[in-house]
Amino acid sequence: MGVSQSDHQTLVAPQPKGILDPATGKPVGNDSTFFGEINDELADKGFLVTSTQALITWARTGSLMWMQFGLACCAVEGLMQASGPRYDMERFGVAPRASPRQSDVMIVAGTLTNKMAPALRKVYDQMPEPRYVISMGSCANGGGYYHYSYSVVRGCDRVVPVDIYVPGCPPTAEALLYGVLLLQKKIRRTGTIER
């Protein structure tokens, strides 16, 4: 096994055997003789043997549709930069949508006030299950610079459940992309059927 070298110093990878489970890195059904035989027979014919949970989770992480709930400067500075051609969030399978009824992820960016909190909850309730929330910037995370103001909600997690917090004032585009990748990792880890 391993990498072999020929006389011309060309590295040749060994022929893959079976289908690898992305969660464990081991061949699917390697502890079961039945699945081992099926994988051996079908691997070279282009067939995939997997579970329904793994298939749904794979589809979920590769096609997240996000909408922004932009309240202040983070929505303009961070989201526009991350969506631009330099960082291009769509290469990770994350595409923007305008309607909450078509969205899986809501990115809350900016200072949430008491008057805007019911609107945030209403938009969140319109999203289909499973739904995820990314809190972007220190104002959305905990009130930020306006934390002690009478009209500011001290974090959007007091209104909607938040899955990923992206810190910064404003957060960089790299930080937002890292938050999206962490959300995809969380979806792979927890799955969608349990949620």
Swiss-Prot record:
Known cofactor(s): [4Fe-4S] cluster
Enzyme's top EC category: translocase
Subcellular location: Cell inner membrane
Binding site for [4Fe-4S] cluster: C73, C74, C139, C169
Catalysed reactions, semicolon-separated: a quinone + NADH + 5 H(+)(in) = a quinol + NAD(+) + 4 H(+)(out)
Molecular function terms from GO: 4 iron, 4 sulfur cluster binding; iron ion binding; NADH dehydrogenase (ubiquinone) activity; NADH:ubiquinone reductase (non-electrogenic) activity; quinone binding
Enzyme Commission number(s) from the entry: 7.1.1.-
Membrane topology: Peripheral membrane protein
Subunit structure comment from the entry: NDH-1 is composed of 14 different subunits. Subunits NuoB, C, D, E, F, and G constitute the peripheral sector of the complex.
Family: Belongs to the complex I 20 kDa subunit family.
UniProt-recorded name of the protein: NADH-quinone oxidoreductase subunit B
Organism: Allorhizobium ampelinum (strain ATCC BAA-846 / DSM 112012 / S4)
Organism taxonomic ancestry: Bacteria, Pseudomonadati, Pseudomonadota, Alphaproteobacteria, Hyphomicrobiales
